[in-house]
Amino acid sequence: MTTIWSAFFTAIGKAAFKKNVKVTKVTLGKNVKTIGAKAFYGCKKLRTVVIKNTQMTGKTVGSGAFTGTYAKMTVKVPSKKLKSYKTILLKRGVSKKAVIKK
């Protein structure tokens, strides 16, 4: 498993992909409303995350969801949500070295 495309999911469960070193790219579709705590914890090879949803908040992204992922990963977010998503993602474990862009 290298790519996860979640067009039909509404949530990524708690610790769903924890320590899965085969995951390299994740695309979170518009339907994904929540990301559980430690959902991608320890996914050291996760290099790209694409977020298409515009409704995520600090309450809908669980603690440590991205802790232990590749430090210099690229995260693509909707342009109108760049600032707020950057704050949320950094609080939820995305490294400060990561590139978060629209």
Q: How would you label these PLM feature ranges?
A:
Residues 63-65, 83-97:
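Short, aromatic/basic amphipathic alpha-helical patches
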Residues 13-16, 36-41, 63-65:
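Consensus positions within tandem repeat domains that build extended binding/scaffold surfaces
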